[in-house]
Amino acid sequence: ITKDKSYTFDYEYRPKNNLTLAATIYKQEQDRDIQTESIDDIRIVSSPAGYTYGSYKEEMNFYGVTSKMNAKFEEDKKGLKLKSKYDYSNGQIIFGYDYQKAVNKRDSFVQSETLKSYNNGYSNKTLEGEDIQPVINRVKVNMEKESHGFYVFNKFDATNKLDITTGFRTEITKYNGKRVNGPNTMPFVAAKTAEINTDRRLENYAGEFGALYKYRDTGRVFLRYEKGFVTPFANQLTDKVRDTTLPKKVGFFDPPQVNVASKYVDNNLKSEKTDTVELGVRDYFFGSLFSASVFLTDTKDEITLISSGVTNPAVNRWKYRNIGKTRRMGLELEAEQNFGNWSLSQSLTLLNTKVLKANEEARLEKGDQVPLVPRVKATLGVKYNFTDKIALVGTYTYFSKRDTREIRESEDLNKDDDIIKHTIGGYGVTDLGVLYKADAYSNIKVGAKNIFNKKYNLRETSLEALPAPEKTYYLEMNVRF
């Protein structure tokens, strides 16, 4: 069950004709109550009490064990945006400040059925005494991300046909919080509780320079350079990996190894740093609005996700890693046409991505495609206006295949998980809706998504997948105050 709430308040004041002051306050809340169930095979390798060190180890296989998770996720975002725009004789200058605080909380409890009977590879056996118990995992998370951003942007009209733009932004980001895992219990393992505290501060800077030339009334060409950054989300600062250092019970010589045992570790994730050059044109041809651009983006420390599962967060493991350096070269095309009551739109994005500096741990080699990035994205849109207030809107969206990296459990429980490659297939979906404009400040939209019941996966690995919903219906209302 998911509950979303969103509140926004906008205010604009013009003390002079050439000065505009604007402010926005917003708050977003999301509460999710999740109950999931999974069936997994549990493997335990243990050297029981009473045996000489290393002289005897038994592998216990518990097949088809049912586990249930009850969890509550809370996300709260609130922020403030201040902006002032001043128009002068040959242009305009904008000053701004952004503030945002995001709080993520999680409280989850996972318990398997009681482990009792197992197979050691030769025969079926039964646990004894206090080792007859379920696997229990508890997690509590409270993480905060707070950011302060300051920026200035200037547009200078060098001539009637040439505009020059410059901009600068700085952001200070603070992370604070903790993640408590435990007390966790399972057969042959002493109860364990681990806590990770996060207290980090990042400072990032961005800038841009651009030029736009109007070669005729309807046509313009532009060139821009941008140096940017992307800061990590608070929940990306920790990994969930297999725990190979479980505490042994009193009397046991070797620590046990359990395939479903996990722990959280700090990953020291860095911010992404980007350098982008873009050249584009926009004009009208034969009554059609057309735009095209080519761009090249080099990213240092691009953040990528390596995950093990998609259906049950209780048994899912993940790692966030910075890729040394990546490159994207792309072409973007857009067009719009109007024929009476009909409006058509098309867009096409072609991307060629590659890794410039490898990350061996993530199995990313020089020349590989960047994970989770499709090479092609295309959209087709149609809109028919029945009246000035009522319109039929349809959209077709296509994504091509993309590569991923995923975590696969190692056969040797004394070693960390393996990383393998996987390719996710492409798909296209069609949405259809009716838009009603009540007035200049509000509208209502009702419709259906994926009207042809296209089968594809929201998330997937080479072993499992989370199917996307088939046809779904929605009601959307927008109001401006």
Question: For the regions a protein language model found, what residue spans apply to each?
Answer:
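Face-selective signature of the C-terminal outer-membrane beta-barrel domain
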Residues: 4-182, 214, 291, 338, ...
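Membrane-embedded beta-barrel scaffold of Gram-negative outer-membrane proteins
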Residues: 10-12, 18-38, 214, 220-222, ...
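Gram-negative outer-membrane beta-barrel transporters
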Residues: 90, 159-164, 172-173, 289-300, ...
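C-terminal beta-signal and adjacent terminal beta-strands/loops
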Residues: 229, 389, 398-414, 434-481
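Transmembrane beta-strands of outer-membrane beta-barrel pores
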Residues: 27-31, 88, 99-105, 170-176, ...
